[in-house]
Amino acid sequence: MDQDSYSLMRGGLVHRLLHATGALGGSAHLSLWLALLLVAVSLLPMLLLTAVDGTLLPKHGAMSLLGDYATLARLLLALPLLVIAAPRSDALLRNAFRQLSHASLVPARRLPRLHALLQQVRRGRDGWVPEALCVLIAVLPLFLSGTALSLLPGVIDWRLDGAVLTPAGRWYEWVAVPLFRLVALLWLWRYLLWTWLLWRLPRSGLVLHAEHPDGAGGLAFLGIAQERFAVLSMAGGLLLAGACLNHITWLGQTLYDVRHLLAGYVIGATALLVAPLLLLMPLLMRTKRHALYRFDALGNRAAALFDQRWQAGAASAADEDSLLDHGDASAFADFSGVYKGLASMAVVPLDRWNLLWIALYALLPLCPLVLLAMSVDELVSKLVGILV
């Protein structure tokens, strides 16, 4: 399929299994149905099992399933988010792949080098070994540590009956958590493929023009594409928000106690998502530096000619003309505008809006903590105190 040639998500062991079952040829809303299926497989058995043993609904001093906000955030929010966001993210990444091939960024004689690079990415996407390793990593903690549960000290947990896993706890540890890990690892593998592509891209023979109106030598579209991976930071933010809410609810901690953790997560997640674009910085810096050298020399010649014509003295034909009526001033102003645009060229294909959106993806899941950690009246009074 032609569209799959430029797709980063479609391919690999899991995609081939879905294709073999005929699932990919059905509904146009496949990702929604798949997300519902994964949520049902991971969560419904636990709802039934906890309802049977009496740990479904909240009890005083004991954390029930419906009171375990970390589990609900993982299975009800983060898991379907990663599945549903994949097609939309893939569409934008696919456009970025096409842009690399069709935007005249590579001279015709070097196109085979770029096509070979894209083919290597497709082979990495379609290979069964990476996704088989993802499956292995997803289940490996079960065999290494015996239990992968993260328990709150001094809190009775719905997953344990004494020191033994309950049936719902076994389903959570053996099915739900590995399933979530697998989906997250598939996303991370695509992210590593994309990062590898950005690392190799400067070696593919790109010819950039510092005068490009996008302010990034023609590579600004990569910053837009990078935003698509911010869904990873949103999913991580949901997990962190659920864990912090558990600590606030069951351990008596406050939002102030976890402020450094929350701030560190937003800053760290944003930095990790922006970091791959820094691999293009040497190429963009070199392009900008060489262009500044050329335009400096050209500007010197243009300024000298301008001075010679209009400021060299009165005994010339220039005295008979008006500077306002002549095209020299307009041409020099146009040149100055081009030079200023060149001097402000970004050395990373990322503008402030790209950075803002990436940071917001990490921040938004944490915002409900503010509403849950304090009353609305208290929040309004503090806002009024700040503003007034």
Where on the chain are the PLM-derived regions?
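Short, flexible helix-coil linker/hinge segments at the edges of structured domains or between repeats
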Residues: 149-164
